[in-house]
Amino acid sequence: MKISAAALTIILTAAALCTPAPASPYGSDTTPCCFAYLSLALPRAHVKEYFYTSSKCSNLAVVFVTRRNRQVCANPEKKWVQEYINYLEMS
């Protein structure tokens, strides 16, 4: 499936804006918190792993780590996020 340059630009811009923030600059908990979610699904081939944000964060989120080690926040209630998690667990 081909992705147009405009769609790819939108996805990458959204990913840059939805990167996780550190939970606490001074605490020992290094799990980031997310304040916004990615609006469109990432290409699954770009995702290599995931983790959940800390329970100390105000928003529950899934953080996907891309092949280029970028961290992107996603809404754990979205169907595509759940499908990606299942895929990563099976591989």
Swiss-Prot record:
Gene Ontology biological process:
calcium ion transport; cell-cell signaling; cellular response to fibroblast growth factor stimulus; cellular response to interleukin-1; cellular response to tumor necrosis factor; cellular response to type II interferon; cellular response to virus; chemokine (C-C motif) ligand 5 signaling pathway
PROSITE patterns, A to Z: SMALL_CYTOKINES_CC (PS00472)
Recorded GO cellular component terms are: cytoplasm; extracellular space
Q: Which Cys-Cys disulfides exist here?
A: 33-57, 34-73
CDD domains xrefs: Chemokine_CC
Per the UniProt entry, the signal peptide is 1-23
Instruction: Kindly give the Pfam families that the UniProt entry links to this protein.
Output: IL8
Which InterPro entries is this protein grouped with?
Answer: Chemokine_b/g/d, Chemokine_CC_CS, Chemokine_IL8-like_dom, Interleukin_8-like_sf
| Main location per the UniProt record | secreted
Task: Identify this protein by name.
Answer: C-C motif chemokine 5
Q: What is the source species? A: Mus musculus (Mouse)
